[in-house]
C-alpha cells in the first residue's frame, strides 16, 4: 500500500468504509496516524474493531482533527457533516487527496488525471493498457480498479518513469486539492449528477478544477465541443499549458482497433494517444496498444456473434449522451436498419434528444423498466417499439427479430436502480440471459 510520513502523528476521521475508505484507513494506520472510522454497516465497523476508534464524525468533536476523509458517494451538498467540519475548521478530503499528499514521498513518477461525463473508464483503461504494453510500470485507480491507496508504490524502470493513471469523477475532484498531474484530460461535459450540484454550471466548475491540478511541466487536454468550451472558459484558471482536442478525427486506422468501434471510441482513442504522447511514448507503441486493447465490461462489450447476429452489452450507458455513440457505431446499410435497441430503466432526463440523430440506424426499440412508457412515446414516431418491461423478455424478442448482420444491443440510456443494484449487475444479467438464449446457437 501507499504510506507517507506526512500522515504520522496526525488525526483523521474517515466516513465510509467501502473499498476506498478502508484503503485510506489502512494507509493512515500504517503511516502512524490516529484514525476514527465510521460506516453505517455493522460488518465494516467490526472489521476495524480494536485497531482504531469507531465513532460517527457527526457525534464527536472535530476540532483538532487534521482532516475528515469521506467516500465520494457521501453527498456533501446535503450532508450535515459539511457544515460541521467547516465550523470546526477541518477540511473534508478524499482518498485521491491523501495520494496527492503522499506524492512527494513516492519514487519519481507521473500522474494522469482523466475526467468527463462519458468515456472516462475506457480512456483511463486504454492509457493504462498502452503504457503497460510499452513496458512502462503503471497502475490505474480512482474511479476504476483498486483504490489508489491500496496500490504498491511504483518504481521507475528502463522504459522511464512509472505512471499512475486516475479516472476521476466530479465527486472525487471535489475532494481533491493538491494533485500534481503530468497530463489532465476533460473528454466531454454534458448535464449529469444534477442531484449533487446546484446547476450545470456548478457541475462544469467541478470538472474544470482538474485542469488546474498540474505539475510544473504538465498539460491539460480539452475538448472543442460547443457545450464544453463555455464552462471550461468560465472555470479553468489556465494554470498550465493546454491543448484543444476536437474533430475532424482521423479514422483511417480505426478498423484495426476491434474494441474501439464507434465515434465515441474514436474520440477516446484520440485523447488516449495524445496523453501517451505527453508521456513520451512513440507512435509505434501507441499504435500497438490501440490494436491490442481488450475493452472493458459493460462498455460496448462484444458478447459474441450468434447466427450472424452481433450482441453488445453497453449497460454502462446510463444517460442518452452515452447511448448516442453506440447507436452511431452501426449505421444502416443499403437502407437496412441493423440495431435492435434494448433501452430503459430509471430515466435521468425526459427526452432522448442526444440519441435522435441516430434513430435512422435502429430497426426496433425494446423498452424496459420505469422509463419504458416514456421512451415508447418518444420513439414510436421514429421506429417500431416493443414494450417489454423486463430485460429477459426484451432480449428474447430482440434476438428473435434480428437477422444475420444485425446488432442486438443493450444500451439503456438510463440508470439501473429501478430493477438492478447497479449497471454492472444489469450487464451481467444481460450476459446470462444471452448465454441461456443462445446455448444452441453457433457463436463466433
Segment roles from a protein language model:
Residues 35-39, 139-140, 165, 410:
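Short beta-strand "acidic-cap" motif of Rossmann-like dinucleotide-binding folds
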Residues 11, 29, 61-63, 72, ...:
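Phosphate-binding loop of NTP-binding sites
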Residues 3-12, 21-31, 257-362, 377:
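Nucleotide phosphate-binding/pyrophosphate-handling subdomain across enzymes
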Residues 1-113, 134, 291, 299-301, ...:
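Short, basic phosphate-binding NTP loop
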Amino acid at each position: 500500500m501507499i504510506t507517507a510520513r506526512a500522515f504520522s502523528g496526525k488525526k483523521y476521521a474517515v466516513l465510509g468504509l467501502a473499498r476506498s475508505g478502508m484503503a485510506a484507513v489502512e494507509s493512515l494506520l500504517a503511516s502512524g496516524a490516529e484514525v476514527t472510522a465510521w460506516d453505517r454497516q455493522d460488518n465494516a465497523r467490526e472489521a476495524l474493531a480494536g485497531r482504531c476508534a469507531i465513532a460517527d464524525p457527526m457525534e464527536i468533536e472535530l476540532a483538532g482533527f487534521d482532516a475528515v476523509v469521506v467516500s465520494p458517494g457521501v453527498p456533501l451538498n446535503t450532508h450535515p457533516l459539511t457544515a460541521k467540519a467547516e465550523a470546526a475548521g477541518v477540511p473534508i478530503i478524499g482518498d485521491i487527496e491523501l495520494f496527492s499528499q503522499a506524492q512527494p514521498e513516492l519514487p519519481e513518477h507521473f500522474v494522469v488525471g482523466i475526467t468527463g461525463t462519458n468515456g472516462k473508464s475506457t480512456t483511463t483503461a486504454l492509457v493504462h493498457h498502452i503504457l503497460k504494453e510499452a513496458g512502462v510500470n503503471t497502475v490505474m485507480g480512482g474511479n476504476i480498479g483498486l483504490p489508489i491507496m491500496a496500490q504498491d508504490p511504483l518504481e521507475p524502470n528502463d522504459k522511464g518513469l512509472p505512471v499512475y493513471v486516475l479516472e476521476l469523477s466530479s465527486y472525487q475532484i471535489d475532494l481533491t486539492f493538491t494533485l500534481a498531474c503530468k497530463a489532465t484530460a476533460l473528454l466531454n461535459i454534458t448535464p449529469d449528477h444534477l442531484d449533487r450540484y446546484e446547476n450545470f454550471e456548478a457541475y462544469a466548475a467541478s470538472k474544470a478544477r482538474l485542469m488546474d491540478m498540474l505539475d510544473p511541466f504538465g498539460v491539460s487536454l480539452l475538448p472543442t465541443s460547443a457545450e464544453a468550451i463555455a464552462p471550461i472558459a468560465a472555470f479553468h484558471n489556465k494554470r498550465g499549458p493546454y491543448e484543444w482536442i476536437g474533430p475532424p478525427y482521423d479514422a483511417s486506422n480505426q478498423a484495426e482497433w476491434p474494441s474501439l468501434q464507434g465515434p465515441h471510441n474514436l474520440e477516446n482513442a484520440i485523447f488516449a494517444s495524445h496523453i501517451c504522447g505527453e508521456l513520451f511514448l512513440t507512435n509505434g507503441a501507441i499504435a500497438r496498444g490501440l490494436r491490442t486493447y481488450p475493452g472493458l465490461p459493460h462498455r460496448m462489450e462484444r458478447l459474441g456473434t450468434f447466427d450472424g447476429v452481433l450482441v453488445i452489452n453497453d449497460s454502462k450507458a446510463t444517460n442518452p449522451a452515452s447511448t448516442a455513440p453506440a447507436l452511431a457505431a452501426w449505421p444502416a446499410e443499403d437502407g437496412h436498419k441493423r440495431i435492435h435497441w434494448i433501452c430503459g430503466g430509471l430515466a435521468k432526463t425526459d427526452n432522448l434528444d442526444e440519441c435522435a440523430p441516430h434513430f435512422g440506424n435502429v430497426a426496433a426499440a425494446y423498452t424496459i423498466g420505469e422509463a419504458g412508457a416514456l421512451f415508447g412515446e418518444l420513439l414510436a414516431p421514429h421506429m417500431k417499439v416493443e414494450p417489454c418491461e423486463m430485460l429477459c423478455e426484451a432480449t428474447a424478442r430482440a434476438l428473435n427479430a434480428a437477422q444475420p448482420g444485425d446488432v442486438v444491443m443493450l444500451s439503456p440510456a438510463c440508470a439501473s436502480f429501478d430493477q438492478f443494484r447497479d449497471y454492472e449487475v444489469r450487464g451481467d444479467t444481460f450476459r446470462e440471459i444471452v448465454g441461456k438464449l443462445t446455448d444452441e446457437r453457433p457463436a463466433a
